[in-house]
Amino acid sequence: MIIAEDEEAICVADDPAIVEIDAISKLSFDADRQHAYKRIAAREGLSEAAQVHLVKEALDNLSFEAAKEDILLTLIRNPGFSSAAESAMLKRLDKFSFESSKNKILEVINQRRTQAPTAVK
């Protein structure tokens, strides 16, 4: 069953991580949301759809720039970081007020790309 559809992702109701992310988004305090989002961002085996949803929810529901940056950097450093999550981040860089935060995200994405193993031909 599809619960949300947009140009970036289709979120499926039976993905427990997406349901968990939605529950976290309803927490009252920013610090609580940050800690819970960060636990998910570091989780192994996080689906592509859940990663994209996490990016959207963290950027929409965290007030502090440092908290947003912390979640995205944690996800980028996750070995399972997906290209769809990367695209979602890049499309939403305007959610950051400070150029230094935008540059930090871009820098870490670039470092990840340069360290990624190349395919054997």
Where are the language model's segments positioned?
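Non-catalytic all-alpha helical scaffold/repeat segments
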Residues: M1-K121
